[in-house]
């Protein structure tokens, strides 16, 4: 988080040209890194998006010195490749870029998805095709306004999706129109001004292109001064004399006049005007920087930083049982929250988002969200244990509500002493935790002496907490059982879990009687903690030198041990010895063991499938792999950096191991191939259909070596799941008007064999939702389509989040694990009508609402699969080749 809110007062574009733009002579507007197999050396939409975001982030850092650290100097970044790791290490410290890179990945994947999703890839308004320049501009500025609305409503996931769609259209303008051919050297001055008419547009009767029978068409454009764009495909049909988009996938380019004018890539087979690709990329980058800067100006620095997660800090999310017996637990939550707020206030680690959801049978909620720590503390302080006490409670419903409002990559803490009354939600909540990539930790005070607090209507099952264990396992979290007198001490893990720790993989992953748990420590790890909880008789920890330490409290040869009932925490002395460590535990049951550490080296990962039948080749993003599909795993290593010692060797990762969950059996090893320069940390692996043939959860472990050849071992923070079918749920651009009836589109496909499926729909809050598809019988490689209608009542609150869930599960004779699709929407009040006035040279652009159109905003497989591909393609320039253009006062 940035230290203060600084009013925006940026100079105009001509006043702030800090660095010279420099692109290589062979540098696309293809979607993502997979596109480069077809057109090597091209600049993708992801490149442009990420580069623009880094430019604006650097400018923000230069203007606001970091708290407690030396200010950044522009000269330190001149002539170097601009990397998020370097930028964030200079501002916040090493290992602080993970959240930013994840947020930027969301924007980039939403951008790339516009070329793949069925209702956006062929819409000319979303790509500035077919001379629909006015309509395209309306959709562009509408998406930017929706980005602002969603960001102010604290729905940053939706804001990033709308921002990605806006940037895609903006970048396409410079590749699909003839703006570059007209000799223009700057972005279009009116494209982000909805009140300014676009001038000199070609009309229907104006011929724009001549016939070209070659792949490369440098002279097919008729030399006039009117603005035009190419037609793609057959809808709408290309009028006589008009330009085509052109390229391998464009059926209109075979009709006279043949050829086309797109500048998407360096390949003449895809881009007839490939020779102008570099100029188009320069202008698209400039325009993207302007769009990011516009959002910064409209939102202010703090909200803009939250939009892109320009912070190493996590969010703080509590789900609290408020039944009468929960007084101690509620007080423990208050103490930890207060401690966190006070300890981190004004620092980079101050939480950026606060979520609070109470529950008390028979109800749950409402959800409280804020970015203000004082408001959160005030709301939390008003919560007290209420009457009642029946076991069980509506815990999973409350957790589902918290997941809906908690940002990705966050920790959620559940305080309760009751089992779930809504256990039927277990699988759905498991999937939602993986879709949101949130880790859930349950703090359960199971105190049998507390009979006066909990009225028990029946003998309680010893398995009643199994749903919590399932959700914790799926999310990478824990279930920690404790007692009243220890809850305040055990709750201290709230703060420790939010300290950007990584969880070290154990072999085996669960305690096996008589067998030690083994984990590896490398030179990049520090502040190692071991947590052990359960009915423990004894344990010991042994370092690589054979030195061991038992369960005795206090200081020991390896570190310091604290005990709170049946919960132990061992904090190892720094620096820890590198090599193989062991933990031996003797217990009556299956104890929980977790080893965590701080490190600058971590990784993000995404899944996708190669696509070759859209407007461009590329990678179709998936949240989870689908059984039977050849899938690409894309890994983005964070914390590599290059600024401190540019000449030093970088860590190298060679392969990834897939393990079954929870037993830990190895399913396979897959080699990793580097993508682009090693300092980018981009790796890819091909997961075969054989490896992904069975629907099941699995974990990912990254294996490699450090610069000295010592073993590196990192694990993904939570498991992934192979889902049995592909489930896509599409809707409007993400915004709902009160009183409207909104169509949604559903597609389900099987790639692993016949499937007999029942489909169920849910919506939160309880709006009316109808569907014309309740069952589906699918053969191999067969799809089914359905339509849903969501009715938004007049009473729907503006800025409220709506989540639609579709579940596809096997019938009784065909027990297939369920697959879930999630669609997030936002209720938004209509924007006031703008006055049609001409802006002065010193005013900011005004974002107005475009007419909503039916276009998908998310793709899901057991979750929303806008979350697939990681960072873009090979680097195309150095920071000596980056433009910082932050002023928008003249817009």
From Swiss-Prot:
> Where in the cell is the protein located?
Secreted
Glycosylated residues, chain numbering = 55
Per the UniProt entry, the signal peptide is 1-28
Name the source's superkingdom. Answer: Eukaryota
> Cross-referenced Gene3D superfamilies, in alphabetical order?
von Willebrand factor, type A domain
Q: Which Pfam families match?
A: GBD_Hemicentin (PF23560), Ig_VWA7 (PF23619), VWA7_4 (PF23610), VWA7_N (PF25107), VWA_4 (PF25106)
Which InterPro entries does this one have?
GBD_Hemicentin/VWA7, HMCN1-like_VWA, VWA7, VWA7_N, vWFA_dom_sf
Q: What is this protein called?
A: von Willebrand factor A domain-containing protein 7
